[in-house]
Amino acid sequence: MELLCCEVDPMRRALPDPNLLYDDRVLHNLLTIEERYLPQCSYFKCVQKDIQPFMRRMVATWMLEVCEEQKCEEEVFPLAMNYLDRFLAVVPTRKCHLQLLGAVCMFLASKLKETIPLTAEKLCIYTDNSIKPQELLEWELVVLGKLKWNLAAVTPHDFIEHILRKLPLPKDKLVLIRKHAQTFIALCATDFNFAMYPPSMIATGSVGAAICGLQLDDGDRSLSGDSLTDFLAKITSTDVDCLKACQEQIESVLVSNLRQVRQQQQQSNPSKTIEELDQASTPTDVRDINL
C-alpha cells in the first residue's frame, strides 16, 4: 500500500531581532535614507509622453494580483512598484513595454525578498506569453543599470514594526492591525498620488487608518483622534498636518476601491443584493476594514 504524504513544511522565518526593533538608531537611519529611493520627479509631467496614470494603475493592479496569487511576501509588491516608479522617472518608456517593465520589477523584488523567487517563465505565463523569458532577462539588466543597482529601497513595510512597538496596543489585536496596515500600503502603491510620499508617512498613515478603522480607541485616549495622530507623528518625525492629510487620503482610496468593487460585482451579478455580494465575493482583508 502506498502512502501519500500531503504535509507541507512551513516556511522557515527568522525570529524578530530585538537588536534591530528596539534600537532607535535603526529607525533614525531609515528616516535618514528613505528619500534617496523616491522617484526623482512626477514623471507623467516631464518624462513620460506615451504612458498615462491610468495605465500605471492597470499594470499595478495586475502586479498586485500576481503577487497575491503567488502568495509573495507583503514587501514584494510595494518594492516592485518602487522600482517601476524610479525607472519611469528617468527613462521615457513606450506603453507596449509597461507590462514587461512590471514583470521585471516583480522579478527583481522577489529575488530580494522571497526565499523562492518568482521565475522568469512563470512571470511570462502571467502575461499570456506576450513576452519571452529571454526578453525579461535582457530588460532585467536594463532596469538594474538605470536604478544603479540600488535595490535595497526603503518601503513602508520597514517602518511598521518600529511604529507598532511604540504604541500602547492590545497584543491580541496586533496581527489584525498589521494586516490592515499592509492592505493600506498595497492600496497606496497602486495609486500614483502616493508615489512621491516618504515611506514613513505612508506607513504611519496606514497604521493610523487601521487603528481608527478597527475602533481601538474605546479604552485608551492616546489611541483616539488627534492624540493618535500626534503620537504617530512624533514616532516618525512627521508633520502632523501632512500626516492627517495622508491618512484621510488613504481612507478615501479605500472607500473608492470598495465602491468600485461593489459596482463591478453588481454589473456581473445584478440579481444579488449588496449584502450577498459582500458575503460572497469581497476580499476579506478589505471587507474587515471599518471606516
From Swiss-Prot:
Native organism: Gallus gallus
Location within or outside the cell: Nucleus; Cytoplasm; Nucleus membrane
Major localization class: nucleus
Biological-process GO terms, alphabetical: cell division; G1/S transition of mitotic cell cycle; positive regulation of G1/S transition of mitotic cell cycle
One annotated GO molecular function: cyclin-dependent protein serine/threonine kinase regulator activity
Record's protein name: G1/S-specific cyclin-D2
Pfam family, one: Cyclin_C
Function text: Regulatory component of the cyclin D2-CDK4 (DC) complex that phosphorylates and inhibits members of the retinoblastoma (RB) protein family including RB1 and regulates the cell-cycle during G(1)/S transition. Phosphorylation of RB1 allows dissociation of the transcription factor E2F from the RB/E2F complex and the subsequent transcription of E2F target genes which are responsible for the progression through the G(1) phase. Hypophosphorylates RB1 in early G(1) phase. Cyclin D-CDK4 complexes are major integrators of various mitogenenic and antimitogenic signals.
Disulphide bridges: none
Superkingdom of origin: Eukaryota
InterPro entries xref list: Cyclin (IPR039361), Cyclin-like_dom (IPR013763), Cyclin-like_sf (IPR036915), Cyclin_C-dom (IPR004367), Cyclin_N (IPR006671), Cyclins_cyclin-box (IPR048258)
Family: Belongs to the cyclin family. Cyclin D subfamily.
Annotated SUPFAM superfamilies: Cyclin-like
Subunit field text: Interacts with the CDK4 and CDK6 protein kinases to form a serine/threonine kinase holoenzyme complex. The cyclin subunit imparts substrate specificity to the complex.
Phosphothreonine PTM positions: 282
A Gene Ontology term for the protein's cellular component: microtubule organizing center
PTM comment: Phosphorylation at Thr-282 by MAP kinases is required for ubiquitination and degradation by the DCX(AMBRA1) complex. Ubiquitinated by the DCX(AMBRA1) complex during the transition from G1 to S cell phase, leading to its degradation: ubiquitination is dependent on Thr-282 phosphorylation. The DCX(AMBRA1) complex represents the major regulator of CCND2 stability during the G1/S transition.
Region ranges (Disordered): 264-291
Keywords for this protein: Cell cycle, Cell division, Cyclin, Cytoplasm, Membrane, Nucleus, Phosphoprotein, Ubl conjugation
PANTHER family, per the entry: CYCLINS (PTHR10177)
